[in-house]
């Protein structure tokens, strides 16, 4: 490698952005084909390619940052800005769903019966499974903070335990949400109530699955001694993302489940 007189990371050419883009194309086209023609082949191919891309891209970043030392303080600063901007874009993504919900619920049209929830819709009880889900996610926010403090204090065993607990709580949330969807008395096809409910809570659920995966990668890295008390941005990014998912759920719970019912 040629000598460089600066602290910035000159990235080597990589095939993963291309394979990631192809995976996204296959998954979105596959989704449309699944909806219209009931075939999941293309979507499955896209998912497999996406998982392969994720694995190999993350592997390369771990090699560059942990083993080759390319993640100098200025590079880490850039990664921090990148993660902050990404979470900001996600805030606006969810803002669209809240806008749709409040637009529909604050001035219900005569077609909806002039009331909210619309005529014929039986909303879910906010004090049953949704309240338990809120408690589960808030507890996971506590355990991920515990993991962060453990890493900063060099408490390896505690960090592993608290991270594993956070992932288990995330999986428990996902299982409860799946059960709630299965037993819901309305579907995504039930007018604007069904659409806004399932799209907003469904995308949040997807983000919980992504966050759990992110934390699972951090757990594997922590087990393999990748994180030190000074050098653990991968975990920090995962923790920020998890707190974001937490806050979005609180807004969803208060707006759609509690006020909306």
Swiss-Prot record:
It catalyses: 4 Fe(II)-[cytochrome c] + O2 + 8 H(+)(in) = 4 Fe(III)-[cytochrome c] + 2 H2O + 4 H(+)(out). InterPro entries: Cyt_c/ubiquinol_Oxase_su3 (IPR024791), Cyt_c_oxase_su3_dom (IPR033945), Cyt_c_oxidase-like_su3 (IPR000298), Cyt_c_oxidase_su3-like_sf (IPR035973), Cyt_c_oxidase_su3_a-hlx (IPR013833). It is found in: Mitochondrion inner membrane. It is a multi-pass membrane protein. GO terms for molecular function: cytochrome-c oxidase activity. One of its GO terms (cellular component) is mitochondrial inner membrane. Gene3D superfamilies: 1.10.287.70, Cytochrome c oxidase, subunit III, four-helix bundle (1.20.120.80). Keywords: Membrane, Mitochondrion, Mitochondrion inner membrane, Translocase, Transmembrane, Transmembrane helix. It is an enzyme of class 7 (translocase). Component of the cytochrome c oxidase, the last enzyme in the mitochondrial electron transport chain which drives oxidative phosphorylation. The respiratory chain contains 3 multisubunit complexes succinate dehydrogenase (complex II, CII), ubiquinol-cytochrome c oxidoreductase (cytochrome b-c1 complex, complex III, CIII) and cytochrome c oxidase (complex IV, CIV), that cooperate to transfer electrons derived from NADH and succinate to molecular oxygen, creating an electrochemical gradient over the inner membrane that drives transmembrane transport and the ATP synthase. Component of the cytochrome c oxidase (complex IV, CIV), a multisubunit enzyme composed of 14 subunits. The complex is composed of a catalytic core of 3 subunits MT-CO1, MT-CO2 and MT-CO3, encoded in the mitochondrial DNA, and 11 supernumerary subunits COX4I, COX5A, COX5B, COX6A, COX6B, COX6C, COX7A, COX7B, COX7C, COX8 and NDUFA4, which are encoded in the nuclear genome. This is Cytochrome c oxidase subunit 3. The gene is mt-co3.
């Amino acid at each position: 490698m040629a000598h460089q007189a600066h602290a910035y990371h000159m990235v080597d050419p990589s095939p993963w952005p291309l394979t990631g883009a192809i995976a996204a194309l296959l998954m979105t086209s596959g989704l449309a084909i699944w909806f219209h023609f009931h075939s999941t082949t293309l979507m499955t191919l896209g998912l497999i390619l996406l998982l392969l891309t994720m694995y190999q891209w993350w592997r390369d970043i771990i090699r560059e940052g942990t083993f080759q030392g390319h993640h100098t303080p200025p590079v880490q600063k850039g990664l921090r800005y990148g993660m902050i901007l990404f979470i900001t874009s996600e805030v606006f993504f969810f803002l669209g769903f809240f806008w749709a919900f409040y637009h529909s619920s604050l001035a219900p049209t005569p077609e909806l019966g002039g009331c909210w929830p619309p005529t014929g819709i039986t909303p879910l009880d906010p004090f049953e499974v949704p309240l338990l889900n809120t408690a589960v996610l808030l507890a996971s926010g506590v355990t991920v903070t515990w993991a962060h403090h453990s890493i900063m204090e060099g408490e390896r065993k505690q960090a592993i335990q608290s991270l594993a607990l956070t992932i288990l709580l995330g999986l428990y949330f996902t299982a409860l949400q799946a059960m709630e969807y299965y037993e819901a008395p309305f579907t995504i096809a039930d007018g604007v109530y069904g659409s806004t409910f399932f799209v907003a809570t469904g995308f949040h659920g997807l983000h919980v699955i992504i966050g759990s995966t992110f934390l699972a990668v951090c757990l594997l890295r922590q087990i393999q001694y990748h994180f030190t008390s000074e050098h653990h941005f991968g975990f920090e990014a995962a923790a920020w993302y998890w707190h974001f998912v937490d806050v979005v759920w609180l807004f969803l719970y208060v707006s759609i489940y509690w006020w909306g019912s």
